[in-house]
Amino acid sequence: MKSPRFRHSQKYIGSKPYYGYYENDHYIVSWCRGHLLELKNPEEMDPKYKLFQLEHLPLIFQPSYKVIQENAEQLQILVKLLQRPDVDHAVNICDADREGELIYREVYEYAGVNKKQSRVYKSSFEAAELEAALNRLESASKYDGLAYSAKARQYLDYLLGMNITRGCTTKLAQNKFLLSSGRVQMCLLHEIRQRELAIENYREQSYYHLQLITDLGLKPVMKTEDQVLNPSPLKSLGENLKDQYLTVEDFKEGTRKQNPKLLYNLTDLYKDAHAQLQINAETAKKHIQNLYEEGFITYPRSSSRHLPTEQVDRVKGVMQALAKSRYSLLVQSVDIDAIDIKHKTFDDDLVSSHFAIIPTTKQYQEEGRPEIEKQLYSLVVKRFVGNFMRPAVYLVRDVSLIDAMGNTYQIKESVLREKGFLEVFQEEVKEESVETFKVPILQKGQELQIYDFELQESKTKKPALHTESSILTFMETAGRKIDDEHLKELMKGKRIGTVATEAAFIPVLHEKNFIDIEKGKIITTPIGRAFIEQFPVQQIKDPLYTAEMEGMIHRIEKNEMSYENFIAQTNAFVQKITQEIIRIPDTVSYNLIETWKKQIEVCQCPCGNGIILDRGKFFGCSNHPNCNKGLPKRVKEKTIPTAQVKKLFEENKTDIIKGFKSNGKEFSAYLAFVNGEVSFNLPSVEELSLGQCPKCQKGKILNRKTFFGCSEYQNGCDFMLPAKIKGKKLSDSQIKKLVNNHVTDFINGFSGEKGEFTAAIRLKTDLSICFEFPTTDDRTVGKCPLCQSRVIIGKTNYLCEQYKRGCDFIVSGMILEKRITASQIKKLLEKNMTDTVKGFVSKKTGKSFDAKLTYDSTQKRVTFIYEKKK
């Protein structure tokens, strides 16, 4: 078992600590730190494999293990304990999953012993549960299928990864750089590229619905099987139907329930952590694992959203424990006594090895805990408690009508009758509802006269670039994306990768320079695009294949497929893959290498004889070992932007970089070369200053993340400005204007009761702040190039005050995902050209680019002026 888990239990068991284990009269307890052994690389089994050569492929051998050196000491402790003559029984209490089983079996087999073996397979390690499990041990042989499935997955990934990497590095990269990948990585890279291609090929289309206007004020909409792209037939139909009648074909009134969200599985928890806490899955994983190991939540690496029926009493116990915590008010919305096996959460058929993630009865003390961990625990608790609240109940009226030509029309209306869980979780309202029904009770055969019609125009939706959250969804539901219904059924329950490993794949692809992540959007790099497009084995890219492999591994776990059969199929497939890679034309290799060279070049090295290259985990000189200049890609938990690396090597100093971390605290600094070594230069208060403090007149106003405050706060100055006002985060530049000029520019995006609004913030003489709302003169940014009237700032556009009254001048405030500032529009109107605006995102490629804007008075639209590449 893991050492943190036992340390939290030892006070109950009363064991004495020894170096690397605990012991009492009945038990010896020791632990692993993840895997203590790993698979050998080919060159460690035969030196001839040190060189990557095509004639070596395919490489097919039985896995052979080596000791992970940093864990060698603990492994030897375990081996000696297992080999002790007085030890006659080994109990596996590692994680209740494939990896936990494999970690134990690797050590046991390495020790070379033959002793009685048992298993504790629990989703929680609360002390009472652990003690009960030790009193009711299961036979280790019951989990042989699980062990073989773990070995099968390990063998599959080992063999495929080794042969794909060596084959592609040798054939595609000509051994000039490493092209490392595996089955899941290739599948995900392919999906990311396919989404980019869908965006590039997207063409927006309008489609139309016919809405009739009838007596009783009702507006039924015509039902169509497909999107209607041509409005003319609908318009003709609408004209013909005027003064005719619709007949009520069916009227239904009933209730519809909206249930609370199901309990968390790991994928859902990762996605909410990404959406609500703005953290990636890899970061969330560390804190979730810590919550589990310390006994605050149940086993997290679960794909289930349900609980077995035997957990009813446990749920009640957890609710009662939470009722004594800071979540007591939340728990009051649950009728604990009414929880029973009839609740939708309890379903034995929908729980496999592990049930959903829920809190335990152990009280979580927030003091001293990491902020992210606290927020993740809160997500788990709120989802758990909300799941057992009453559903929301809507009263629904649904009317189906028919015209004289047999076309069908529909009206639906809902009234929220019982709020249920929506009383607490208001953000989860899914459907529009009205206070009272406008649709009256209608009788079948009743006629409604048609007075007029409207054509409703809608636009097809452009696909969005993938985010980490959407990739997690793709991994979980890959089978359900297939159109064929039979294949959908076959793929049910299968996925890409496992919940235990899904957090790692996006960071790995990013680390290998196959993808970039810009503002949360995932895009392929030039080398990532070239690699996935030229990789010849379609099966490896196909989610169906990857999920089928997971399905076969699952069948081994259930003893429905033999390990030997799986190995034979894997070996045959590897033979096929290597042959396809070997047949790749040499011209493909040349183009890929040229793409790689362009991608990794950053700037000239100061040594004068080399180029600074992006080497993956670090930047270094191409003239190595003659030049040792370099920089790690991540410094103090901050990934250094390539633009700043370029600046460092060209100018010896970066700009101020925010987001370095030391002892859990963020700080800003320059990176600079001092005597040839990279060092931190902390910015002075003057450099960070946004202006002189208007209160004490001595200190400087500094950005403190959640507020702006005076540098003299320790000497008694309490002047402070919030970082966010009415939902709008204020920029350093606007705070600088507020402090120095006592008023900001007009800022868009404040949130009020009536929606978003624009205002300036003024610092009054008593140092309080207030809003100033723009007059027409304030909103004027210049003269219209078409009619010479005033151009004013609208809600979402810059437009002529005569717009729709004879003038067509209008410019969107958001162009290709980039907000256009009023100052740039002023320059556009004065000089017919803005400055270079950075960060437009191409509709065709999804890539960002920089350009100036100009206004074409003939075509009456803005156009781009691209800077010539030097």
From Swiss-Prot:
Residues 180-185 are annotated as: Interaction with DNA. GO terms for cellular component: cytoplasmic replication fork. It comes from Bacillus anthracis. The keyword Transit peptide does not apply. Its EC number is 5.6.2.1. Monomer. Residues 1-128 form the Toprim domain. A zinc finger (C4-type) spans 603-627, 693-717, 784-807. It catalyses: ATP-independent breakage of single-stranded DNA, followed by passage and rejoining. Residues 143-578 form the Topo IA-type catalytic domain. Belongs to the type IA topoisomerase family. This is DNA topoisomerase 1. The active site is at Y299 (o-(5'-phospho-dna)-tyrosine intermediate). SMART domains: TOP1Ac (SM00437), TOP1Bc (SM00436), TOPRIM (SM00493). PROSITE patterns: TOPO_IA_1 (PS00396), TOPO_IA_2 (PS52039), TOPRIM (PS50880). PANTHER family: DNA TOPOISOMERASE 3-ALPHA, PROKARYOTIC DNA TOPOISOMERASE. It is an enzyme of class 5 (isomerase).
